[in-house]
Amino acid sequence: MIELTVAQIAEIVGGAVADISPQDAAHRRVTGTVEFDSRAIGPGGLFLRLPGARADGHDHAASAVAAGAAVVLAARPVGVPAIVVPPVAAPNVLAGVLEHDNDGSGAAVLAALAKLATAVAAQLVAGGLTIIGITGSSGKTSTKDLMAAVLAPLGEVVAPPGSFNNELGHPWTVLRATRRTDYLILEMAARHHGNIAALAEIAPPSIGVVLNVGTAHLGEFGSREVIAQTKAELPQAVPHSGAVVLNADDPAVAAMAKLTAARVVRVSRDNTGDVWAGPVSLDELARPRFTLHAHDAQAEVRLGVCGDHQVTNALCAAAVALECGASVEQVAAALTAAPPVSRHRMQVTTRGDGVTVIDDAYNANPDSMRAGLQALAWIAHQPEATRRSWAVLGEMAELGEDAIAEHDRIGRLAVRLDVSRLVVVGTGRSISAMHHGAVLEEAWGSGEATADHGADRTAVNVADGDAALALLRAELRPGDVVLVKASNAAGLGAVADALVADDTCGSVRP
């Protein structure tokens, strides 16, 4: 964050100082980072008091100041130097931190944080900062990681860790930028119409990227049309002097070209795009290879990330880097060198016993679930060696009235892709629908065991991650391939972590 005095911050957010004199507030400077976890605070930092499930952020204010925080941003005096803002009604937001906000104090701190980020972003943009916004129903984090890699050779990049993309993570990321930052990459998530527009007001992007319109959070939005309208808030926010990168292979995204005043850059898997990929092939771990075409030049790309769907993510990252002045050759080299970064997102690990774990346990919606299953099938069914495949799947959250049908479709798809073992984790109607869909699809098919899998092909429903892990440890064989995927609330990341951490052959049958 840029250096500001406590008094300057109080003026920006409309707060009053407490437990610090006006004279001291005018001289005490915030020189460190903004943190909502008191354990992460450092010298000169700004600590955000936010409500938690087990503890009130006010309870940690003293420890944050003891650790070096210059001041606390809170909704009431906390006995240490603070900027106090009055409670407000909780808005219709995505940030789960307001789940325990019973008195409006958390909403007040979030509103103040947004004001501070808005002021800082304006100063940094005036100094030459380029802000890039990314939205889409899926792929935001993977695209952000690739984009950070391709922009790094051009200057200093700030991007959110993991999926910090809501009303807390978005301004928090903005405030990581300093006067040395050249590129600020921001993920922009939404559960309601207007969410993306609100985020764009905090840090107006000069480049916007829309990946896709899918069914993530369908239960919150109500319809796919509303999802498209909400994603379109990003291109609508980009000024005429900026650029909007659109996935031309998604009709709902392509239609957004008429909604923006900015210049449109289309990416595609065929030559209809301004930036496009030549023939795509996958290696034995489903890592894409393709020729990148743009600006009458071309270069070969070999991605280090898993899944055919990563091609579009890479094209969007490439288009942004090209807009920022990189050459096609530079972009291709950076994409090829980019490793997987964010945890639990299509991370592929092959253990010493030959078991391959595809960890995509951070989140799930129907589109990303299909992509994960397709990657699993590709890895398991290589011509030189067919391997047993396991799909360990949990619930896809927030699908509303479509939840039963979508889970049923995923269960059936697992059978159609010839997955050897489907382990459905959890309870409830959606989980039952996924399990029953697989069972019914198997019965509807030939009913005959395949030569590769014999009687091994089964679909089972277990109660939780511990039960799934116990089953896997008992039944895995050397060379098996395991996909672990669910919405984050299912907690299957712990299953993937345990599988990767298991001693070589220590828990696998010979």
Curated annotation (Swiss-Prot):
<keyword id="KW-0963">Cytoplasm</keyword>
<keyword id="KW-0067">ATP-binding</keyword>
<dbReference type="GO" id="GO:0005737">
    <property type="term" value="C:cytoplasm"/>
</dbReference>
<dbReference type="GO" id="GO:0051301">
    <property type="term" value="P:cell division"/>
</dbReference>
<dbReference type="GO" id="GO:0008360">
    <property type="term" value="P:regulation of cell shape"/>
</dbReference>
<dbReference type="InterPro" id="IPR004101">
    <property type="entry name" value="Mur_ligase_C"/>
</dbReference>
<keyword id="KW-0547">Nucleotide-binding</keyword>
<dbReference type="Pfam" id="PF01225">
    <property type="entry name" value="Mur_ligase"/>
</dbReference>
<dbReference type="InterPro" id="IPR005863">
    <property type="entry name" value="UDP-N-AcMur_synth"/>
</dbReference>
<comment type="function">
    <text>Involved in cell wall formation. Catalyzes the final step in the synthesis of UDP-N-acetylmuramoyl-pentapeptide, the precursor of murein.</text>
</comment>
<dbReference type="InterPro" id="IPR013221">
    <property type="entry name" value="Mur_ligase_cen"/>
</dbReference>
<feature type="binding site">
    <location>
        <begin position="136"/>
        <end position="142"/>
    </location>
    <ligand>
        <name>ATP</name>
    </ligand>
</feature>
<keyword id="KW-0436">Ligase</keyword>
<dbReference type="GO" id="GO:0009252">
    <property type="term" value="P:peptidoglycan biosynthetic process"/>
</dbReference>
<dbReference type="Pfam" id="PF02875">
    <property type="entry name" value="Mur_ligase_C"/>
</dbReference>
<keyword id="KW-0961">Cell wall biogenesis/degradation</keyword>
<dbReference type="InterPro" id="IPR000713">
    <property type="entry name" value="Mur_ligase_N"/>
</dbReference>
<dbReference type="InterPro" id="IPR051046">
    <property type="entry name" value="MurCDEF_CellWall_CoF430Synth"/>
</dbReference>
<dbReference type="GO" id="GO:0005524">
    <property type="term" value="F:ATP binding"/>
</dbReference>
<protein>
    <recommendedName>
        <fullName>UDP-N-acetylmuramoyl-tripeptide--D-alanyl-D-alanine ligase</fullName>
        <ecNumber>6.3.2.10</ecNumber>
    </recommendedName>
</protein>
<comment type="similarity">
    <text>Belongs to the MurCDEF family. MurF subfamily.</text>
</comment>
<dbReference type="GO" id="GO:0008766">
    <property type="term" value="F:UDP-N-acetylmuramoylalanyl-D-glutamyl-2,6-diaminopimelate-D-alanyl-D-alanine ligase activity"/>
</dbReference>
<dbReference type="GO" id="GO:0047480">
    <property type="term" value="F:UDP-N-acetylmuramoyl-tripeptide-D-alanyl-D-alanine ligase activity"/>
</dbReference>
<keyword id="KW-0573">Peptidoglycan synthesis</keyword>
<dbReference type="Pfam" id="PF08245">
    <property type="entry name" value="Mur_ligase_M"/>
</dbReference>
<keyword id="KW-0133">Cell shape</keyword>
<dbReference type="GO" id="GO:0071555">
    <property type="term" value="P:cell wall organization"/>
</dbReference>
<keyword id="KW-0132">Cell division</keyword>
<keyword id="KW-0131">Cell cycle</keyword>
<comment type="pathway">
    <text>Cell wall biogenesis; peptidoglycan biosynthesis.</text>
</comment>
<dbReference type="InterPro" id="IPR035911">
    <property type="entry name" value="MurE/MurF_N"/>
</dbReference>
<dbReference type="InterPro" id="IPR036565">
    <property type="entry name" value="Mur-like_cat_sf"/>
</dbReference>
<dbReference type="InterPro" id="IPR036615">
    <property type="entry name" value="Mur_ligase_C_dom_sf"/>
</dbReference>
